[in-house]
């Protein structure tokens, strides 16, 4: 099990890696999952747009892109997070930057746990799962 935190073209956000990893592990366990190899790549809006275009053929900015490499109950994936979008969203929603960052960090894990947010009613289910996970910090 390894959770890594990397940057591409941005400064590493001020997160407590050990505590964050333990929190991620606990959230995964609450869904009956174990951590495999999880890589967080913090980047800029321009980088996430490039990844979105290249791998998903989507031509828009987003806060997170999750590449799922899970096997059975073991969560594995690459999670690209745009710190620019995190900042914009925090301002737009009146949220603290750190809270929005943690929301997006766990959002990717929840996707790996099988929770979707694109279909009817799924956004509300995801938001409820995010809030429950954030309360576990």
From Swiss-Prot:
UniProt key word Nuclease: yes
InterPro entries: MetalPrtase_cat_dom_sf_prd, YbeY
Biological processes annotated in GO: rRNA processing
Binding residues annotated for Zn(2+), in chain numbering: 107, 111, 117
GO cellular component: cytoplasm
UniProt subcellular location: Cytoplasm
MF-aspect GO terms: metalloendopeptidase activity; RNA endonuclease activity; zinc ion binding
Top-rank EC class of the record's enzyme: hydrolase
A Pfam family it matches: YbeY
Keywords, in A-Z order: Cytoplasm, Endonuclease, Hydrolase, Metal-binding, Nuclease, Ribosome biogenesis, rRNA processing, Zinc
Keyword Metal-binding assigned: yes
Record note on cofactor: Binds 1 zinc ion.
SUPFAM superfamilies with a match to the protein in the record: Metalloproteases ('zincins'), catalytic domain (SSF55486)
Listed EC numbers: 3.1.-.-
CC cofactor: Zn(2+)
Major location category of this protein: cytoplasm
PANTHER family linked: ENDORIBONUCLEASE YBEY, CHLOROPLASTIC (PTHR46986:SF1)
Entry's family note: Belongs to the endoribonuclease YbeY family.
Role according to the record: Single strand-specific metallo-endoribonuclease involved in late-stage 70S ribosome quality control and in maturation of the 3' terminus of the 16S rRNA.
Name of this protein: Endoribonuclease YbeY
Lineage: Bacteria, Pseudomonadati, Bacteroidota, Bacteroidia, Bacteroidales
């Amino acid at each position: 099990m390894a959770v890594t935190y990397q940057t591409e073209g941005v400064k590493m956000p001020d997160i407590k890696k050990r505590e964050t990893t333990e929190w991620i592990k606990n959230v995964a366990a609450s869904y009956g999952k174990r951590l495999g190899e999880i890589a967080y790549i913090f980047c800029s809006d321009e980088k996430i747009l490039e990844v979105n275009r290249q791998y998903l053929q989507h031509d828009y900015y987003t806060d997170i892109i999750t590449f799922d490499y899970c096997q059975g109950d073991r969560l594995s994936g690459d999670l690209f997070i745009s710190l620019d979008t995190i900042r914009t969203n925090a301002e737009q929603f009146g949220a603290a930057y750190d809270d929005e960052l943690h929301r997006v960090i766990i959002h990717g894990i929840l996707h790996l746990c099988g929770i979707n947010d694109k279909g009817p009613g799924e956004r509300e289910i995801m938001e409820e799962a995010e809030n429950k996970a954030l309360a576990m910090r």
